[in-house]
């Protein structure tokens, strides 16, 4: 039977769950398909010695990492999570990676290891961490040339050196060596280790475990330089909108980084290359160079003055000198001005008019959004006193309907400032009924409407009943009168006669039997009605 060859790539795929866990600890996310593609197809094309089956060699990983983090269009931001995870596997290898990790190089012959003194402590688990001298004397152990295998492996030869480090003089170097030999206290661990590997042992009490700044004050009072970490840049890029989508938010982020981290010229280029596209970066640099001012305080277009204040090529500014720090401060200020000017969109008043107050938005928050729209879509500054009238009118017309109507009816509206309008709007907003009160009012109005409708229905029913009763009463009265007339109908056909009135001729003075007009003689036979016979 043949045996399967295990490679670093196949090993990571077999332990993919551990790889994802390590990536999560680095605040990144990796996908298996892209992991295989980058390892076997992309990184071998960098010509740094990366094999198609992968490697855990820190030197090669660092070279690939430098190509991935290259600023400008030659960088590969989409590959950052994957090379960071590879680096984490090599720095702090899990048990299944340790057999494949390259052994630590032996010490150079020009740097012999001095045996420890009688009060020396066994070396710490990392070669970069100092050995603290205990107060209790112990038996000196055997000198150890290599650090413990469990410690983090960092190839110092492949780390990028600080770009602005000033070379110390020979006398200063000798003094530093004497101090290092005589003192019992040593400097805290490397800030880069603290930044990139938060899972290390806690450093000394006087060191920091927060994100390291590019320029920070060292223990001897001198500025020390530490570059941005890949995790910082990756998190800033992925946790914020793009510059084209929301320039204000990204400008605020870069402004906070410029103030707190005090980056150098190279750091600024790396920051812009990571957070901005190539076209956005060029626009920002152009606007920043336009903001350069001459000796008279007005914007200048002289190439020598512009290049001196905001160079496009790497300048020779030492951060250890006052002049160099002043140049860096001015450069950051101009860069911030370029970000603000480049973030302004073309004039579009329709965008400003489209900003309306939300149903539950406070007037203050609405005013901030309105001012931001003025800054972004118009060349006007909403804080300018000359633009206060325009902003006030927009605030009134684009407020919520109930607030806008009451603001329009204010007395002496023309003399009201924007602050007065905001205070009045806040009063109106705070007097609004709560959702519970609104529901109660609506319920009460519905009940009152139902009561009115029910009362109206009952009134109409009563009117209908009264009308029907009157009609029935009239009908019954008509029937009763008719029946009474029917009963008295015969008597009316024979009107009553007076005592001396004739019933035959209706004359008075005699009765009917003595009426001279009544025929006398026998009555004739009644005429017989002849019936037709069959013979007829």
From Swiss-Prot:
Biased composition (Basic and acidic residues): 449-464, 484-517
Pro residues bias locations: 108-121
A Pfam family this chain is assigned to: Gag_p12
PROSITE patterns: ZF_CCHC (PS50158)
Region (Disordered): 108-218, 449-536
Keywords per UniProt: Capsid protein, Coiled coil, Host cell membrane, Host endosome, Host membrane, Host-virus interaction, Lipoprotein, Membrane, Metal-binding, Myristate, Phosphoprotein, RNA-binding, Viral budding, Viral budding via the host ESCRT complexes, Viral nucleoprotein, Viral release from host cell, Virion, Zinc, Zinc-finger
Zinc finger (CCHC-type): 500-517
Positions of transmembrane segments: none
InterPro entries: G_retro_matrix (IPR000840), G_retro_matrix_sf (IPR036946), Gag_p12 (IPR002079), Gag_P30 (IPR003036), Retrov_capsid_N (IPR008919), Retroviral_Gag-Pol_poly (IPR050462), Retrovr_matrix (IPR010999), Znf_CCHC (IPR001878)
Motif (PTAP/PSAP motif): 109-112
Post-translational modification Phosphoserine, affected residues: 190
Residue ranges that the Swiss-Prot or TrEMBL entry lists as coiled coil: 436-476
Protein's name according to its UniProt entry: Gag polyprotein
Site (Cleavage): 129-130, 213-214, 476-477
GO annotation, cellular component aspect: host cell late endosome membrane; host cell plasma membrane; host multivesicular body; membrane; viral nucleocapsid
Location of the motif PPXY motif: 161-164
